[in-house]
């Protein structure tokens, strides 16, 4: 199985390269990729401001130059693993670059179909596309597919919050015609 921890050194190296090229900047909250207006909107076909309005994921503005900038290398999390590499502050990988590097290393490029929930379009998948281009992975993916989300009266069901429903439960409550 592919493990994110096997890619931490590569994530650190790419973060450092982007920082050295001036494509990224460092704050006390990590290293962020600068995202320019013209680099954005490949999936949604809209500008940065419209992406925020159409995205279903929250974007943390934090200590960034722009709320659209992507975390490449984050600060340590209390109780979490901390990695140390030359040229980077002690910390942890950002998940957008992590996914870009893992998929490009494990799959033949271009990736035929990259799939995820609609909540991943922005900022995650938009960030993956931009990152792939910035690190030299032209023609990263041919097709992007996004499925809808299961919701109840309180919003999106989330496994990470312990909200799980089986098909058996769905069919008990809502039998097929």
Language-model-derived ranges and their functions:
Residues 1-6, 147-148:
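Acidic carboxylate-rich catalytic motifs and surrounding loops in phosphoryl-/glycosyl-chemistry enzymes
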Residues 10-177:
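Alpha-helical recognition segments enriched in aromatics with Gly/Pro capping
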